[in-house]
Amino acid sequence: MGDTSWIEMFVAAWSAADGDAVAAHFAPDGVWEDVTMPFRHEGRAPIADMWTRVPTEFSADSHFEVANPVSDADRYAFQWHWTGTHDPTGRRYDIRGASMGVVREGLIVHHYDYWNPAQLAAQIRPETES
């Protein structure tokens, strides 16, 4: 297996909502695909925009941790743990997921996320009055 330290830096940029740092890991025509939502961002600018908006539209204290990263010359995979507070409702969330992708010449050409959005929706749903 290859060096996985770049995965730690990549995911640290997620937590920092540093869209430019996230996008810098991608080839100019790279793709971020959330298979479970589904949505797809193509190119560095749309990927950077997505990660810059996270703190202002969803959660200012969003945090990701990496587990079990693996990487070689042309692919990678890791598990992640996402925690934070959904700003609009004040509800905490705690989600696990996995990512994998394809690398070319040291840059991500296609990133895939897999997780359970229904779990997130249930955790951030506003409490109803009795």
Language-model segment annotations:
Residues 64-70, 82, 96-102:
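Hydrophobic/aromatic beta-strand elements that line small-molecule binding cavities or substrate pockets
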Residues 110-130:
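Low-complexity, intrinsically disordered terminal/linker segments enriched in charged
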Residues 4, 20-73:
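A solvent-exposed, acidic/Ser-Thr-rich amphipathic alpha-helical stretch
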Residues 86-88, 92:
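Active-site neighborhoods of divalent-metal-dependent phosphate/nucleic-acid chemistry enzymes
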Residues 1-28, 125-130:
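Short, low-complexity N-terminal intrinsically disordered segments enriched in polar/charged residues
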Residues 79-85:
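Generic short beta-strand segments
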Residues 10, 22-23, 30, 43, ...:
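Hydrophobic pocket/interface hotspot
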